[in-house]
Amino acid sequence: MEPRRHSRERKEQYCMCGIIGYAGHRPAVPVIIEGLRRLEYRGYDSAGVGFIQGRELKVIKAEGKLAALEEKLAHYPNTVAMNGIGHTRWATHGVPAERNAHPHIGGNNELAIIHNGIIENFQELKEGLLAKGYVFKSETD
C-alpha cells in the first residue's frame, strides 16, 4: 500500500508518520525517543509514547514537535520499561491536537496501538462501535 501524498509538502513526495517500537534489555523510552528524533521529519504535529511501568500502561502524548513530548517525559525520570512504542504524527485526518496523537488506548487501558494511514470505511466501523456503546476519545481512534 502506498502512503498518501500530503498537501503541505513542497515537493511531490510521499508522507507517512514515524513509527517505532523497541523490546530489549535497555530502558525503552530513551531508545524510542532517539528513534523518534530520526523520524521527526515524518511528522511534527504531535508525538507520543506508550510503555509498561510496573504493571501499568503509561501513554504520554504532546501536541507539536518532539521537544514538547520530551518535556512531558522529564516528569518520568525513573522509567525502566524495557519495551514500548512511539509515534510522530503528520495530521492527515483530525486536527493536530494532543487528543488525536498516538498511541491510542483501548481495552480498559490495557492496550496501546499506533497505526499509519486512514481506514477507508472508518465511518461505518465507528457507527457500529457507537451502537455497541464504545466511547471514542479522539477524531483518530
Where are these regions (language model features)?
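Conserved short alpha-helical segments that host acidic/polar catalytic motifs at enzyme active sites
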Residues: 2-4, 10-141
